[in-house]
Amino acid sequence: MNKIKIFLIAVILAAGAGRLPVFAEAKYSLKEMTPAVEAALEGRRERFDELTAFKDKGAIGENNRGYVEVLAPDSGAKALADAENKDRAVIYKTIAEQNGLTAELETIEKVFAQVQHDKAKPGAKIQNDDGQWVTK
């Protein structure tokens, strides 16, 4: 049951980036939309296009732990990745706390990583489960 709950949480996180249909958001929600989560979701929306551009260039990829990683030195990539990862961490931690899943934070991160990998465009850099970076 927890794996289903965690998967649905990941769907909500992806929806928060504004790229999933509304019906996906209705399956599961945060118990309380905290100011920190609202700010994190807004930050993710604001940097989405810039992050996508860095991913398209291969400068940033999606790792296997639910975060982005700088793969090639590029002006601004590190600051952008750091901001994105900070916001993701806020969201993951809040969802885990509100749903009594703090012991499963790493699982939430990995499920979200899989969602991000599934959503990645062809040509995007993703890290597989054994740590190798591959092109989708």
Task: Indicate residue ranges for each PLM-predicted region.
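Bacterial N-terminal signal peptides that target proteins for export
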Residues: 1-8
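C-terminal segment of classical bacterial N-terminal signal peptides
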Residues: 15-22
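Amphipathic, charged alpha-helical segments and their helix-to-coil junctions
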Residues: 24-86, 98-136
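Amphipathic alpha-helical coiled-coil segments
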Residues: 91-95
